[in-house]
Amino acid sequence: MNNFIEFDTSSLWIALPEIFLLSAIVIVLLIDLFLDKNFKQVTYYLIQLSLFITGLLAFNLIDHPQIIIFGGSFVLDNMASVFKVFMMAATMVAMVYSRHYLRTHSLFRGEYFVLVLLSVLGMMVMVSGYSLLTLYLGLEILSLSLYALIAIARERADAIEAALKYFVLGAIASGLLLYGMSMIYGISGSLNINDIASFASNTNLDSRETLIINFGLVFLVIGIAFKLGAVPFHMWVPDVYQGAPTSVTLFISTVPKIAAFAMLVRILVDGLDSMHAYWSDLFMVLSILSIALGSVVALMQSNIKRMLAYSTISHVGFIMLGFVAGTPIGYGAAAFYMLVYVLMSLAAFGMIILLNKQGFEIDQISDFKGLNKHAPWFALMMLIIILSMAGVPPLVGFYSKFFILQQVVSAGFITIAVIVVIFAVISAYYYLQIIKSMYFDETDKKITIYASIDIQLVLSINAILILAVGLFPDFWMKLALSLF
């Protein structure tokens, strides 16, 4: 712990993306205070510029040899840099999609943008955290920002209710996570991930030490499973996705998943990989439950945000399944799936926002009726997105599922793979409901696209990218594998 006192300023360049973003938050907040409400566009462009420069700084650190600084609490490695670039890109896209929605729902305010930047800062700390304390600090910065974002539409009772549910359940999950961390710290004597890894790999551990580590592991897995939205810790997901403003749902469903995945890797792969035999069984149960419940309950939903919430739970199950194999290729397959999920989810919620207009919010599957007749290009884009989510070849959603199942079979869990395939087939049905609504159901209502050209352009690129990555998945899979 004394290492925390030794603060070497010559190493600050390693945390330059975080330092720049923190400075940008302060500057944007100050500038926004003096801007008239008619000039909030300036704040929007400032945060986009801040995200772009932060992403550029992180990109310049890709392929840099691993460096651990600040007394072992902060790490620069390839995974951290790549994830930060993806987080900046995904947040920029999410903000482009959200701009029209924020204007029409009177949420185009400086505090919204600052909260987004604060949550991104928390995620960056989580991605580079290399001690239990740093990881928890990043998680709380993220969580507190998200609580406020969900409740930012103060006049909406469902948004306030969703924020309260998320806050209460999040506080319980944070307590469980902290309790698990305290047990690991108590038995290993260190908060540092490297020290914990050395202790856990010690073959001379007695039964008492092994028991305490296992108990700590259980609480850690429960805490992280809640943040990911895995069954049975998923209760907040449907309510938050449905109750929060759609722009917030878009953000919550995508970028924080990258940070939660990174936290999972730091604690369980970097720190407790030698205990894989213990935590892999937990992951297997959680992943199967998530895939099963997410696939079945989504069939009963008519609200598209709620349906996509259960779809997210199912996707989280697939991501966790990649960890069961316990190999670098398995972890790489999980990372690939996670990045693909973010790409698909951005596009799906982007389509929902695209169809929103003043005084009317798209939230039912039936609202997509006749989309092909009135906006055939965007019906085609939605078709690509939905088929990819369903795992139809040759789209990227198919390859992400295939790589995960390949690793599960390679690890000898053939029965698990068969069960997962069955539920994947079941899940295709609720995706087909949207396609049926767009192409085969008639409506008297005329669908008009009110969104600006930049949103339409970025959304089209997003959907085409899903198709392109599916046709040429090798580069992205190699990138994911290079992280481990």
Curated annotation (Swiss-Prot):
Enzyme class of the recorded protein, top EC level: translocase
Transmembrane segments: 11-31, 42-62, 79-98, 113-133, 134-154, 167-187, 211-231, 248-268, 279-299, 313-333, 335-355, 378-398, 408-428, 457-477
Coiled coil region boundaries: none
Record Pfam families: Proton_antipo_M
Lineage: superkingdom: Bacteria
A GO biological-process term: ATP synthesis coupled electron transport
Membrane topology: Multi-pass membrane protein
Keywords assigned: Cell inner membrane, Cell membrane, Membrane, NAD, Quinone, Translocase, Transmembrane, Transmembrane helix, Transport, Ubiquinone
Subcellular location: Cell inner membrane
Statement: the UniProt record of this protein carries the keyword Hydrolase: no
Substrates-to-products reaction catalysed: a quinone + NADH + 5 H(+)(in) = a quinol + NAD(+) + 4 H(+)(out)
Example of a GO cellular component annotation carried by this entry: plasma membrane
UniProt family annotation: Belongs to the complex I subunit 2 family.
PANTHER family per UniProt: NADH DEHYDROGENASE (PTHR22773)
Protein name in UniProt: NADH-quinone oxidoreductase subunit N
